[in-house]
Amino acid sequence: MPGEIQVEVAYALPEKQYLRKVKLPEGASVEEAIIASGLLELRKDIDLKKNKVGIYSRPVKLADTLNDGDRVEIYRPLIADPKELRRQRAERAAKK
């Protein structure tokens, strides 16, 4: 159908991945795709004010316009500081 795009919305947890395909009108935003996917109702831990989003691993804003075939990704907050984890790994490696 002209004027319509299809995108995927993804949200990954350590034990499960959610992947929803949604059809939207051309010019739809990232936020509209997330809402249409139903993931906000399914996963109450998703807060669009806190969770960052991206398209194919590139950070985007909720108001950004989607293209046909895009994959919208909802990212979980970091639970550990990456620099601290690297430091700890380096210390463990130095002890071996």
Curated annotation (Swiss-Prot):
Gene3D superfamilies linked: RnfH-like (3.10.20.280)
SUPFAM superfamilies attached to this UniProt entry: MoaD/ThiS (SSF54285)
InterPro entries, alphabetized: Mopterin_synth/thiamin_S_b (IPR016155), RnfH (IPR005346), RnfH_sf (IPR037021)
Leader peptide range in chain numbering: none
Pfam family, one: Ub-RnfH
Stated family: Belongs to the UPF0125 (RnfH) family.
Protein name: Protein RnfH
Lineage of source species: Bacteria, Pseudomonadati, Pseudomonadota, Gammaproteobacteria, Enterobacterales
